[in-house]
A protein has these predicted regions:
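A structural-propensity feature for long, helix-poor, extended segments
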Residues: 145-181, 203-230
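Glycine- and small hydrophobic-enriched segments that form the cores of compact globular domains
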Residues: 85, 112-119, 131, 153
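Helix-rich "cap/lid" substructures immediately adjacent to catalytic or cofactor-binding pockets
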Residues: 90-105, 128-157
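Conserved phosphate/anionic-ligand binding catalytic regions in large, soluble enzymes, centered on
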Residues: 107-125, 169-174
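Functionally critical mobile loop/hinge segments
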Residues: 184-287
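Generic N-terminal targeting/processing segments that precede catalytic cores or assembly contacts
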Residues: 1-108, 131-132, 241, 248-287
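Alpha-helix capping and helix-loop boundary segments enriched in small/acidic/polar residues
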Residues: 84, 113-116, 138, 162-170, ...
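Alpha-helical support elements that line or immediately flank enzyme active sites
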Residues: 123-134, 179-187
C-alpha cells in the first residue's frame, strides 16, 4: 500500500475533512482498482478469519514441541474467579492474545497482522470489544483500516519482520497498529491516532527476536499479551490528550535504525536471549 508516512495520511485527512481510516480505504481502492464495497468485503473476510481464530481456540491443544498450549484457558479460569487486578476487558484481552498466539503455534488458521508471530495482538484488543457489544462490525472494519494504514507506513519506512528488525518490528508494529485502531474506535482524530501508535512503538523499541529452538512459541506467545495491553494503555493515554514528544514518523524511522543496528544473534536466529539459555538449548536439542 503506497502510504509513505503518517504525515501524508494526516494531510489527506485534513484537506478533505475525512477520518484516518477512509484515507486508507481510498488508497486501497485506488491501488487495487476496486470499489469501496469490494475493499470492504476483503477487509470483512480478514476480520471474520481473525474472529474465528479467537473463538475457535481449543484449550486442550498443544504445539508439537509441547512448549505452548492451554494458557488461554488458564487465564479465563483465573478471570472467572474474579480475583484479577485487571477489569473484564483487559482480562479478555490477555486471554485472547494467549489463545490466538497458541493457535498459531498449533498450526491453526490466523491472520498475520502484520506477521504470524504477532497474530494475537489485533484480535486481542478488538474481538472482546465486539463480543461485549462495545463495537459494531462496521466500526471494527474501520478500525482495521486504521491499523492497516499504520502497518503500511511502518513496512515502508522501517520493517515488520523479526529477521530484519527484531521483535520490535513484529510485536512493536502490531501494538502500534492496535493502539491506533483502538483510538480510532473511540473517535480519536488522526493526530491522536499517531500519538497512540508512536507511544506504543516507543515502549517496545529495542525488543529482540529470540525464539527458543527457532519456533514462534517462546517467548513469542506471551509477547502478544504485552503488545496488546501496551496498545490499550497507549490508546487511553492518547484519548486523554497525552502526546508523544517525538513525531510518529520519526519514531518509526528510529525503530528501523535500531533494527538495523541490532546484532544478527538477536534477529530471529535463536542464538541469543532465552533461546541461548541452558533450557533453551536443551529444547533445541530435544527437537
Amino acid at each position: 500500500m503506497a502510504l509513505n508516512s503518517m504525515q501524508e495520511i494526516f494531510e489527506k485527512a485534513a484537506s478533505r475533512s475525512i477520518p484516518f481510516w477512509r484515507v486508507v480505504l481510498e488508497t486501497d481502492m485506488e491501488e487495487r482498482q476496486v470499489t469501496e464495497e469490494q475493499s470492504m468485503e476483503k477487509m470483512r473476510a480478514a476480520w471474520h478469519a481473525m474472529l474465528e481464530s479467537a473463538v475457535s481456540y481449543q484449550g486442550d491443544q498443544r504445539s508439537r514441541s509441547g512448549l505452548v498450549g492451554g494458557d488461554g484457558a488458564r487465564m479465563r479460569r483465573y478471570a472467572a474467579a474474579d480475583t484479577t487486578y485487571s477489569g473484564p476487558y483487559v482480562q479478555e484481552v490477555i486471554a485472547t492474545a494467549l489463545s490466538v498466539g497458541e493457535s498459531n503455534a498449533c498450526m491453526r488458521k490466523i491472520v498475520a497482522a502484520p506477521t504470524a508471530g504477532a497474530c494475537g495482538v489485533l484480535p486481542a484488543v478488538l474481538v472482546p470489544l465486539y463480543q461485549m457489544g462495545r463495537a459494531t462490525e462496521e466500526e471494527i472494519l474501520q478500525a482495521l483500516y486504521t491499523a492497516s494504514g499504520i502497518g503500511a507506513v511502518v513496512s515502508f519506512r522501517a520493517c515488520i519482520a523479526g529477521a530484519s528488525g527484531g521483535c520490535q518490528a513484529e510485536i512493536g508494529t502490531a501494538s502500534a497498529m492496535a493502539a491506533g485502531a483502538l483510538t480510532s474506535l473511540r473517535g480519536g482524530d488522526p493526530q491522536q491516532i499517531g500519538h497512540a501508535a508512536a507511544m506504543a512503538l516507543k515502549n517496545l523499541m529495542g525488543l529482540v527476536c529470540d525464539p527458543v529452538a527457532g519456533l514462534v512459541e517462546v517467548p513469542c506467545v506471551k509477547r502478544n499479551v504485552v503488545g496488546s495491553v501496551n496498545a490499550v494503555s497507549c490508546a487511553d493515554m492518547a484519548l486523554a490528550g497525552v502526546e508523544s514528544r517525538i513525531p510518529v514518523d520519526e519514531v518509526i524511522d528510529c525503530m528501523g535504525e535500531v533494527g538495523r543496528r541490532m546484532p544478527m544473534e538477536m534477529r530471529e536466529t535463536a542464538l541469543a536471549g532465552p533461546a541461548a539459555t541452558p533450557t533453551g538449548k536443551a529444547v533445541k536439542e530435544r527437537m
